[in-house]
UniProtKB/Swiss-Prot annotation:
Location of the protein in the cell: Nucleus speckle; Nucleus, Nucleoplasm
Free-text function comment from the UniProt entry: Probably involved in intron recognition and spliceosome assembly.
Gly residues compositional bias, start-end: 95-107
CDD domains with a match to the protein in the record: RRM1_SF2_plant_like, RRM2_SF2_plant_like
InterPro entries: Nucleotide-bd_a/b_plait_sf, RBD_domain_sf, RRM_dom, RRT5_SRSF_SR
Name of the protein this chain belongs to: Serine/arginine-rich splicing factor SR34B
Compositionally skewed regions (Basic and acidic residues) per UniProt: 81-91, 108-120, 192-201
Pfam families: RRM_1
Keywords: mRNA processing, mRNA splicing, Nucleus, Phosphoprotein, Repeat, RNA-binding, Spliceosome
Biased composition (Basic residues): 207-243
Major location (coarse): nucleus
GO biological process: mRNA processing; RNA splicing
Chain's gene name: SR34B
Length: 278
């Protein structure tokens, strides 16, 4: 189990009249809250320590609430006990590379949410390119309790994977819906995850394309060899030309083909023979 310090966050710049219930409402969406220690000094702002069951939920809360505008107060959220972790660090712990994904958005970039998984999984297609795993998680919570979210991008667009904690929540979420974040909104499609359809890895797809290219190469080489043999054949040339041209050109082509196997003297003899005929 993770240490308490990694599961507890500090929340600063709270309004002086905030209540503990309001603090819980702010952070319970990121995971089960164990304890809230709210401090309201004589002179505001106030602050609080919020402990989660899981350190990954604490990271979620830092990412989602650091800088959040609550009733005109921009909250400051970081790890407690001197273990400062900014919202930028929290993003890195999940996406690894920010919104751009791997290599600045090369089509295979991925952004991950918490690593807890379940068998009650749905696929969300048609997401806007600006969607993050946190945006997806927040949106899909309308269907039930989400324990995992992931966003990845490929040549077909932006797709999400969401795991629910129960079968009922997963079934409730299976419906087309309108996805919104700070940048855009799209109508997305939600369907149940199919292991046979959705578990193909990118590396498997790449190896398949290579094998197909290897399969084509022999046919290309055979077609080239056939074209060369036809172009060198005197008979092939004579079939494509008129009779008048074939009588004047075919002897010369035959003499050249024979000249490769005969000595220079023999070639002259053959050449004179044809000249005499002409």
């Amino acid at each position: 189990m993770s240490s308490r310090s990694s599961r507890t966050i500090y929340v600063g710049n709270l309004p002086g009249d905030i209540r503990e219930r309001e603090v819980e409402d702010l952070f319970s969406k990121y995971g089960p809250v164990v304890q809230i220690d709210l401090k309201i000094p004589p002179r505001p702002p106030g602050y609080a320590f919020v402990e989660f069951e899981d350190a990954r939920d604490a990271d979620d809360a830092i990412y989602g609430r650091d800088g959040y505008d609550f009733d005109g107060h921009h909250l400051r959220v970081e790890l407690a006990h001197g273990g400062r972790r900014s919202s930028h660090d929290a993003r890195g712990s999940y996406s690894g590379r920010g919104r751009g994904g791997r290599g600045g958005g090369d089509g295979g970039g991925r952004e991950r949410g918490p690593s807890r998984r379940s068998e009650y999984r749905v696929v969300v297609s048609g997401l806007p390119s600006s969607a993050s795993w946190q945006d997806l998680k927040d949106h899909m919570r309308k269907g039930g309790e989400v324990c995992f979210s992931q966003v990845f991008r490929d040549g077909r667009g932006t797709t999400g994977i969401v795991d629910y904690t129960s079968y009922e929540d997963m079934k409730y979420a299976l419906d087309d819906t309108e996805f919104r974040n700070a940048f855009s909104h799209e109508y997305v499609r939600v369907r149940e995850y199919d292991s046979r359809r959705d578990s193909r890895s990118p590396s498997r797809g790449r190896s398949y394309s290579k094998s197909r290219s290897r399969g084509r190469s022999p046919s290309r080489s055979r077609s080239r060899s056939r074209s060369r043999s036809k172009s060198r054949s005197p008979k092939a040339k004579s079939l494509r030309r008129s009779p008048a041209k074939s009588t004047s050109r075919s002897p010369r082509s035959r003499s050249r083909s024979k000249s490769r196997s005969l000595s220079p003297r023999g070639w002259v003899t053959v050449e004179r023979h044809w000249i005499a005929l002409i």
